[in-house]
């Protein structure tokens, strides 16, 4: 069987469960062959060995059962990084890159070093690592309540040789932080489990997804802690579900009445990030 035949066969199996059936198939075959996806696309007439064909078919069967591609191949690209992921962590999403972009922009306000940032619910470490790679003078805390998630984050932190600038802390939301920080950033659980995609529900960790009956449980607790864990001129940036902006802004204004607040939209035009910048300064 040639690569072209294998891909076409896989597409027929995946098209009913994945809108990116061709991409999925090409990524999975690239993983089997140890090639780049570009080489798979270019070498359409290459003949697979029986062993390669069998391994590919096994992965396609798992993908047809809605297992995410990132778990099948063991990594995910995020903000130009190649991150190790498995079922212990939520798979980093493209829309979360906006959270990184806005945090990098916010960091430009601060001219002291080290800039101290806390990534609450760090998971795979994606946000913390992306920030550290672009902010060489920052100290970043990656906090997670899940020791399993922190084990994955540690692999990625070490891969990018950031052990000296990213400190991983186990605990609930802000409680492990040793002192107030300049920037709090978080992509907290904000989904209602009964409303999420079947494949996500079956395979990704519920601890990283479940936002409670209205999706706002973590926001309430995290934002309530912000006055304690933010420095007087600090900022908080939060990823949100597309219908949650007004509720989260309300929580921020209650907790930080002196703060400026704002909402940013993603490329699809959906509300995606809510932020607050604390204007209260101690003289």
Swiss-Prot record:
Keywords: Methyltransferase, S-adenosyl-L-methionine, Transferase. GO terms for biological process: methylation; translational termination. Its EC number is 2.1.1.297. Substrate binds at residues 187-190. CDD domains: AdoMet_MTases. It catalyses: L-glutaminyl-[peptide chain release factor] + S-adenosyl-L-methionine = N(5)-methyl-L-glutaminyl-[peptide chain release factor] + S-adenosyl-L-homocysteine + H(+). It is an enzyme of class 2 (transferase). InterPro entries: DNA_methylase_N6_adenine_CS, HemK-like, N5-glutamine_MTase, PrmC_N, RF_methyltr_PrmC, SAM-dependent_MTases_sf, Small_mtfrase_dom. S-adenosyl-L-methionine binds at residues 121-125, 144, 187. Belongs to the protein N5-glutamine methyltransferase family. PrmC subfamily. This is Release factor glutamine methyltransferase. It comes from Chloroflexus aurantiacus (strain ATCC 29366 / DSM 635 / J-10-fl). The lineage of its organism: Bacteria, Bacillati, Chloroflexota, Chloroflexia, Chloroflexales. The gene is prmC.
